Regions:
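Alpha/propeptide regions of enzymes that mature by internal proteolysis
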Residues: 23-230
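Sec/Tat signal peptide C-region and signal peptidase I cleavage site
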Residues: 18-22
């Protein structure tokens, strides 16, 4: 039986203070690199090592924030930013393509102290969607902004826009071409688009990255980052 590699990652990467049972101020962080179904058999040992190294970097980055007394929101943002900067995950620089060959990114974050949240959707020129989602939460009267409106808000906040091709990667592009071939073949057999999309193998159905953290003050925060897939 084939084991989904990212399912292993999602369940195994968890960092907890060694002093959690003794200290008065325990803290913790958990991350996942995607809830997709990329089969482990598709990775060489070297590739799997690279994935695990980046996941370790992400969780350790968030852990360091908490260990130094930082807030859970900062830990979540820091951990997810690491994953967004990597081409290995379906977020930020590793985002899969839309059907027309571009990239549209989404992210959201929530503060457990007051249940405030911020989100962005369908942004094309934002290098770190999770950071923009946090700006929406902190500096906007809205909970969610999308598309051009989100990017106009980003410029108002001093966020530099980037070219959409920053998110291009060869493996994702090859996956797009294969997926489009399968969709076209399915539609040629009289299947409408949604039915054809559902017929895609699990290897084309990828998930988000995310993190949840508890800081020394007992505050919980969570965030996630992903993209619009094959729209």
């Amino acid at each position: 039986m084939k084991t989904p590699l990212l399912a292993i990652f999602a369940s195994s990467l968890f960092a907890l203070s060694n002093s959690v049972f003794a200290a008065e101020t325990p803290f913790a962080i958990a991350i996942h690199g995607g809830a997709g179904t990329i089969e482990k058999a598709r990775f060489t040992p070297a590739q799997e090592k690279q994935y695990r190294a980046k996941l370790t970097e992400a969780v350790e980055t968030g852990y360091k924030v908490l260990h130094q007394g930082g807030e859970s929101l900062d830990a979540v943002t820091a951990a997810i930013t690491v994953l967004e900067q990597s081409p290995y995950f379906n977020a930020g620089r590793g985002a899969v393509y839309t059907y027309d060959g571009g990239h549209e990114l989404d992210a959201s974050i929530m503060d457990g102290r007051n249940r405030e949240a911020g989100a962005v959707a369908g942004v094309k020129h934002i290098e770190s969607p999770i950071k923009l989602a946090r700006l929406v939460m902190n500096n906007s009267v809205h909970v969610m902004l999308s598309g051009q409106g989100a990017e106009e808000f980003a410029k108002e906040q001093g966020v530099e826009l980037v070219e959409n091709n920053l998110f291009d990667t060869e493996p994702r592009y090859k996956a797009l071409l294969k997926a489009k071939q399968k969709l076209d073949k399915a539609k040629a057999t009289s299947k409408e688009y949604q039915a054809a999309h559902k017929a895609l193998p699990n290897s084309y159905k990828m998930g988000t990255v995310g993190a949840v953290a508890l800081d020394k003050n007992g505050n919980l925060a969570a965030g996630t980052s992903t993209d619009v897939r094959f729209s």
